[in-house]
């Protein structure tokens, strides 16, 4: 391995941010080791590793939004427009040696790759100022991709970005469901493949008929599309996503905090199969 930085022994009273390399290369795996001495001459050593993300100059993907006409959001349960399914199919001629996906959206999204979730995070990309900062997430997809057809799926709901209770109009930008993603694949033969959000992205309304970060979600199981995020699915009635030139890559920043995950699932206390007349439920 090439040593990119060696501080040598630094005599200082500081115990954090002592020194470091001026610039690290993007999309690069690094190992580090540090040895610390105390005032008695005793020392201890620790080693670990990290990987740098995509830099702002390396974004080649297009912002792609739903073709649906803009709908003004209103407060209240069930008043929001449906969530949007974004589907991007692509074909690989070889199994990847390394694959990283960088993704974000305007809204909140749930990612699937060939029908499987790469991790269990929820509410990505979470709440930021949007105008000045929008976080993107990094996923290791190496084990989820295969030779032949592959499918990236993103289901996007309103989240904080479109919520009338948390986000006033942002400089006149309409809060359409919009995605941005870039998949960087290193092939076994040393070649490189890039898959981006572009005109190849297809869209469809989700079975989630309305979603609000405070008021909850309205789901119609009759409208579910089994297999929509898997190879072999026929997307004949899907509409192509529309390129959104209003968005800027300059606000993108790698996520800097831990993801939101589910730590406990509460079982349902009441299940209704059929109600023949109007009924009031007190839960």
Enumerate the language-model features and the residues they cover.
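Extracellular and select intracellular beta-sandwich modules with Ser/Thr-enriched
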Residues: 43-47
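An aromatic-rich alpha-helical recognition segment common to small helix-rich domains
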Residues: 19, 33-34, 275
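Short, solvent-exposed loop/edge segments of extracellular or virion-exposed proteins
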Residues: 63-74
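Accessory beta-strand-rich segments of carbohydrate-active enzymes
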Residues: 29-33, 38, 51-56, 76, ...
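Single conserved hydrophobic/aromatic residue that forms the stacking wall/gate
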Residues: 273-283
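Short, surface-exposed loop motifs enriched in S/T, G, D/E and P with embedded aromatic residues
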Residues: 265-272
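Catalytic cores of secreted or luminal carbohydrate-active enzymes
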Residues: 226-261
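Recognizes extended acidic, P/S/T-rich segments that occur
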Residues: 1-29, 39-42, 63
């Amino acid at each position: 391995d090439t040593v990119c930085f060696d501080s040598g022994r630094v005599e200082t009273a500081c115990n954090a941010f002592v020194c470091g390399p001026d610039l690290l290369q993007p999309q690069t795996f690094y190992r580090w080791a540090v040895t610390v001495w105390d005032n008695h001459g005793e020392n201890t050593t620790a080693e670990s590793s990290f990987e740098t993300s995509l830099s702002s100059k390396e974004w080649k993907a297009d912002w792609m939004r739903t073709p649906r006409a803009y709908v003004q959001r209103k407060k209240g349960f069930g008043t929001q427009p449906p969530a949007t399914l974004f589907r991007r199919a692509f074909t690989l001629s070889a199994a990847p040696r390394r694959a990283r996906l960088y993704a974000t959206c305007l809204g909140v999204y749930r990612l699937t790759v060939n029908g499987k979730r790469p991790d269990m995070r929820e509410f990505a990309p979470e709440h930021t100022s949007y105008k000045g900062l929008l976080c993107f997430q990094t996923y290791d997809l190496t084990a989820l991709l295969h030779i032949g057809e592959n499918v990236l799926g993103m289901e996007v709901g309103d989240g904080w970005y479109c919520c009338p209770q948390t986000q006033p109009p942002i400089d006149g930008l309409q809060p359409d469901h919009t995605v941005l993603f870039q998949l960087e694949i290193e092939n076994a033969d040393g070649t490189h493949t890039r898959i981006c959000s572009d005109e190849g992205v297809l869209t469809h309304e989700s079975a989630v008929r309305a979603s609000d970060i405070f008021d909850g979600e309205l789901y119609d199981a009759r409208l579910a599309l089994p297999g929509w995020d898997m190879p072999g699915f026929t997307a004949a009635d899907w509409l192509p996503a529309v390129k959104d030139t209003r968005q800027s890559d300059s606000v993108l920043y790698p996520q800097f905090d831990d993801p939101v995950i589910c730590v406990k699932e509460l079982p349902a206390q009441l299940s209704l199969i059929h109600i023949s007349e109007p009924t009031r439920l007190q839960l």
